[in-house]
């Protein structure tokens, strides 16, 4: 709806507001969005071979990063909107007021910068695999195996990019910088989630949303 994020909200500790109506609308699409990240991970053979505990840590760590990437690559410069979960087009202020605060700016800025890369579905999938297989997540036991998995995806990614022959100078290192940007978005969201927990009624949080983000380190 066009008026999402426009009604009066609750002030949060970092100076912006949570529009509870907008927050409620966003939570309706969060569960299927998280489920799609899980489904993606399960399709990767190397992920399925990891211990269950490591799988959970990796999924919790990358979930916001991958959801942000999927939104960012659907940035429309003409309308200045992102499409969330493939169905909800939102403007920067709507996403900000719906609970994400400054994280909204980071996702929109990423969307603007990614537009020049013109990534295809395979490149987005490989980028998601690289984010998923991050061996520096706290608590992992199979660190070496996960690191080798990520290296495999990075090599495949670089090979595919060279095959596509993008016209942007230094395309590969510039794209890898976006991994750093997405990691920062994930870290910022972990902090924002604490604000959302304080400002929004608990019943508005879907169980899967809580399960994924409640125990993340800030």
Swiss-Prot record:
InterPro entries: NHR-like_dom_sf, Nucl_hrmn_rcpt_lig-bd, Nuclear_hormone_rcpt_NR1, Nuclear_hrmn_rcpt, ThyrH_rcpt. Transmembrane segments: none annotated. Residues 1-215 form the NR LBD domain. It is found in: Nucleus. It comes from the Eukaryota. One of its GO terms (cellular component) is RNA polymerase II transcription regulator complex. GO terms for biological process: cell differentiation; negative regulation of transcription by RNA polymerase II; positive regulation of transcription by RNA polymerase II; retinoic acid receptor signaling pathway; thyroid hormone receptor signaling pathway. It holds the Pfam family Hormone_recep. One of its GO terms (molecular function) is zinc ion binding. Keywords: DNA-binding, Metal-binding, Nucleus, Receptor, Transcription, Transcription regulation, Zinc, Zinc-finger. The keyword Transcription applies. 3,3',5-triiodo-L-thyronine binds at residues 36, 85. CDD domains: NR_LBD_TR (cd06935). Belongs to the nuclear hormone receptor family. NR1 subfamily. Nuclear hormone receptor that can act as a repressor or activator of transcription. High affinity receptor for thyroid hormones, including triiodothyronine and thyroxine. This is Thyroid hormone receptor alpha. It comes from Oncorhynchus mykiss. The gene is thra.
């Amino acid at each position: 709806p066009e008026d999402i994020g426009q009604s009066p909200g609750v002030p949060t500790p970092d100076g912006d507001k949570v529009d509870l109506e907008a927050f409620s609308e966003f939570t309706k699409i969060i569960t299927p969005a998280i489920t799609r990240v899980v489904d993606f991970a399960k399709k990767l053979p190397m992920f399925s071979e990891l211990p269950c505990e490591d799988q959970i840590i990796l999924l919790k760590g990358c979930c916001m990063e991958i959801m942000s990437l999927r939104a960012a690559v659907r940035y429309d410069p003409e309308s200045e909107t992102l499409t969330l979960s493939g169905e909800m087009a939102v403007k920067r202020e709507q996403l900000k007021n719906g609970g994400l605060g400054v994280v909204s700016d980071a996702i929109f800025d990423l969307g603007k910068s990614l537009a020049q890369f013109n990534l295809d579905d395979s490149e987005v999938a490989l980028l998601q695999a690289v984010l998923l297989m991050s061996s520096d997540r706290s608590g992992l036991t199979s660190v070496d195996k996960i690191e080798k998995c990520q290296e495999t995806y990075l090599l495949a990614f670089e090979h595919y990019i060279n095959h596509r022959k993008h016209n942007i100078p230094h395309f590969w290192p510039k794209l890898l910088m976006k991994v750093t940007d997405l990691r920062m978005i994930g870290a910022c969201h972990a902090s924002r989630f604490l604000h959302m927990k304080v400002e929004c009624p608990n019943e508005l949080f879907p169980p899967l949303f809580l399960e994924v983000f409640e125990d993340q380190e800030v």
